[in-house]
């Protein structure tokens, strides 16, 4: 674990807990510049109070209303990223995020970290299909560590039941059993 590499010009994409952790960790690992880009506005961030201020105090930058468009490579090596500015518009009584025409811009980057929230659509057994299970934040979206651990424990029981060919209906997990 002593051989940690982080680029000098780091770009983080995202606006949540993980993006803040990634940006601040990159700074602590020696990155000269860390810029975090979020496609929405400050009020839409999903972070703890004070996290943005902590990022800025550590010399990180947060740029709002911009999203990635393309990676820029030279001789098969990452050298930058092309982004485009975004804006929120009301269309048919619904707000939608759209790209601003001709607002593309490029910045240097030798390390890009995608810290974007994604959530899967699952059936009631936390399965994507008959043989793939998901657990924790990937299955539920951003939650607390305790919730992620609880969900992972429940899903691990379901995986065990599936592999051992036990009936899921007769394998109840009590809340008291979940730490």
Question: What are the residue ranges of the model-derived segments?
Answer:
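A Rossmann-like FAD-binding core segment of flavoenzymes
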Residues: 1-6, 28-122
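Rossmann-like dinucleotide/flavin-binding elements
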Residues: 1-49, 111, 115-167
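Phosphate/diphosphate-binding loops
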Residues: 60-70, 159-171
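Post-kinase regulatory C-tail/linker adjacent to protein kinase catalytic domains
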Residues: 172-179
């Amino acid at each position: 674990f002593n051989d940690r590499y982080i680029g000098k010009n780091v770009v983080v994409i995202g606006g949540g807990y993980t993006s803040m952790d990634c940006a601040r960790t990159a700074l602590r690992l020696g990155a000269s510049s860390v810029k975090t880009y979020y496609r929405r506005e400050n009020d839409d961030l999903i972070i703890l109070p004070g996290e943005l201020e902590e990022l800025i105090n550590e010399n990180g930058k947060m740029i709002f209303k911009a999203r990635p468009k393309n990676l820029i490579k030279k001789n098969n090596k990452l050298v930058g990223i092309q982004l485009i500015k975004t804006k929120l518009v009301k269309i048919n009584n619904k707000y939608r995020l759209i790209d601003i025409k001709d607002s593309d811009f490029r910045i240097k980057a030798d390390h890009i970290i995608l810290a974007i929230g994604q959530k899967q659509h699952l059936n009631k057994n936390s399965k994507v299909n008959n043989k793939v299970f998901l657990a924790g934040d990937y299955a539920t979206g951003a939650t607390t560590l305790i919730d992620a651990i609880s969900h992972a424990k429940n899903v691990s029981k379901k995986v065990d039941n599936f592999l051992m060919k036990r009936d899921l209906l007769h394998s109840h997990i009590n809340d008291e059993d979940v730490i």
